Amino acid sequence: MKDLVLFVCVGNAGRSQMAEAFADRHGLNASSAGTVPSAKVNPVVVEAMKEKGIDLSSNKPKMLTTEMVNQASLVVTMGCSVEEVCPRPMLSRMQKKLVDWDLPDPKGKPIAEVRKIRDEIENRVMELSKSP
């Protein structure tokens, strides 16, 4: 089984959902979660991903668990805007390989901005899929 890449953000409603979907598309073993999961995936994110042929409409945000972190060989945090719920400090204490992709949260942004975030995530996931 391939090493697991875990994508983590606060709500698991946008960035980490897109990253997991692109990772799956590019042959990575991936999962995603949030420290304070939203009720649903951001509808603008669903629309932006549909343009790439990826359907997130049935995805549900997931709560980050210690078990998820323990199973991952790499944890990618997606930038934090709310310090109290940022996953990075907690994850740093768990001695995992940790990378932060400082990306803006698509929440409340128009589709044009969400597309830019989506494309940046896809580019970073493609780079990740090429690394050993």
Please provide the spans of the model-predicted regions:
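Short glycine-rich anion-binding loops that position phosphate/pyrophosphate groups of nucleotides
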Residues: 13, 80-83
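Redox-cofactor binding/interface segments in oxidoreductases and associated redox assembly factors
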Residues: 76-78
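Conserved active-site segments centered on acidic
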Residues: 1-66
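Short, charged/polar "capping" segments at the starts of alpha-helices
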Residues: 38-41, 82-86
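Phosphate-binding/catalytic loops
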Residues: 84-132
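Short, basic, helix/turn surface patches
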Residues: 57-67, 83-92
